[in-house]
Amino acid sequence: MVFKIEDLIIALNQLSKFSNNFLGATLTLKNWQSTRPNFDWLDNFQINHSTEMTFSGVVTESVTAFQLQWIQEWVTAFINQGSQFIRDFSTIIEQKRIGELQGGILLSRVSSYSSWLTDKTKAV
């Protein structure tokens, strides 16, 4: 399954908008910033004060499996951080499938990143 950066932007913005409704713009922005893993490619994702995410590059490029893993790690950390403020935050996101890409790439098993990697490895 091939995803483009623009697919990630759409999914991340859905998650950001949902979080913004619960946590407010300031906390959502801080959560995105504080949970971003130290991976240079992720620095291309910019978040403005209204918590809209953009990408400073070619959004029609395909995303590699390695890049998807970094996005998954970031999303997992972001949701776990939000769960410290809102009870059942991760459960609500999972049940409503907020920001999910086709095949559940971003949010399926958000509470267990290692399970996600294991399942994807078995499928290959």
PLM region descriptions:
Residues 1-124:
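Long, compositionally biased intrinsically disordered regulatory segments in eukaryotic proteins
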